[in-house]
Amino acid sequence: MEVLRVSAKSNPNSVAGALAGVIREKGAAELQTIGAGALNQAVKALAIARGFMAPSGVDLVCRPAFTDLVVDGAERTAIRLMIEPK
C-alpha cells in the first residue's frame, strides 16, 4: 500500500489528486499524519478525493489507526488513515 505523508502545510487539493490517482492505480492508499493540523488537511483531502471518485461510482472508506514513528531520532505518535474503495 502506498503511503502519502501529509503535513499541516499540505494543499488538500493536491493531496486529494494524489490520493485518487493512487487508489485508481493500486486499489488502496494510506495517509500518514503527525499533529492536528496535518490530520485536518488529510481529512479535507479525503473529502475532496471522495468527490473526485464519486462520478465513476467509487465510494471511499477510511480506517484510522495510531502508529509510532521515529522522526529525527525521536519517537512520535502518528495517525494513519487507510483508504480503500467501498
Range-by-range predicted roles:
Residues M1-A29:
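An N-terminal amphipathic alpha-helical segment
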Residues S10-P12, G37, D68-V70:
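Residues that cap or initiate secondary-structure elements
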